Regions:
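Conserved NAD+-utilizing ADP-ribose enzyme module
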Residues: 1-94
Length: 94
């Protein structure tokens, strides 16, 4: 079985992960963890959309098992796969 490694963007300062916040009815927000399939996609996303914060962010690799436990621990609604970091094009998965 092949192991698909995923890449996340994390803050060096407080350890929080980069998420997409989606508003729900009633004013609440849900968070989706941004997941990249390649490390260079994550770096492109940072450079394109948050270049001024690049020195405060790092790329972290995670296995599918780590991703599952991380999502449970932080209470994310799902994850969002970034398929094109420049536009960005994102697929939300609950």
């Amino acid at each position: 079985m092949l192991l698909q490694i995923n890449y996340l963007v994390r803050s060096k300062r407080d350890g929080k992960y980069l998420v997409a916040r989606v508003p729900e009815e009633g004013g609440a927000e849900v968070s989706y963890l941004l997941v990249f399939q390649q490390d260079y996609d994550a770096m492109s996303y940072i450079n394109t959309h948050g270049g001024e914060f690049s020195n405060r962010l790092m790329i972290e690799s995670v296995s599918p098992m780590q991703l599952k436990s991380l999502m449970q621990r932080w209470g994310y609604t799902g994850f969002a796969i970034v398929t094109d970091p420049l536009l960005p094009n994102i697929q939300f998965v609950s």
